[in-house]
Amino acid sequence: PCVERNGMIFGYLGPGDPPPLPAIDSLVAPDSHVFAFKGFLECNYLQAVEVGIDPAHASFLHRYLQDEDTDDAYGRQFRGGTGDEDVPVTWIMRNFPAPTIDVQRTDFGLQIEARRHLSESRDHVRVTNLIFPNAIVIPMSKSMAITQWHVPVDDHNCYWYAHFTSYDAPVDTPRMREQRMELYRLPDYKPRVGRFNQWGYDPSEQEDETYTGMGMDINVHDQWAVESPGAI
């Protein structure tokens, strides 16, 4: 009843024969093009799903007050460029904070489109897919997407399990892992920041670098948003 696919093990706990895994990109791509990782959150799984599918919060929670060279954005969400003109996503999110949101029901869950009208000739469109009951597929860059499952530990804690899927070159696995190990520790994959150190909050950073003052990794921003209310 268990299947290993691109660094993850999926188990079927229902009656009868297990159904086939869905043919989503991260499960059919070659393992050379997929990087797997996970992280612990002190919130219930539904809170983690909600923060992942919300298409508007990025303009505030993940707002960077300065734009960086988009060539240095590999492996980091909301940091690259978009479109043929390579406009920094940080600039778009900062200057167009109120997207038009359209939600469509699908046979797998929901498709959520966030459209930011940049000019008379340009729109920025970001599409998020929610695969019921607990998976999301979100764009990470022009050539990479994240497929992420949110799995309960108990009523107040969960793990996220993510596939980072590249649509062009093979994934730079050592680089992706090094980036994420800056925030997480082994063997339990718990974050190095949290309520115990105010999620790394730095008021001086908040003045001129980030909206939250909690570092450059968006996982910390989301972690603060779902953990700070306390157990729900």
Where are these predicted regions, by residue range?
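Short, Gly/Pro- and small/polar-rich lid/capping loops
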Residues: 4
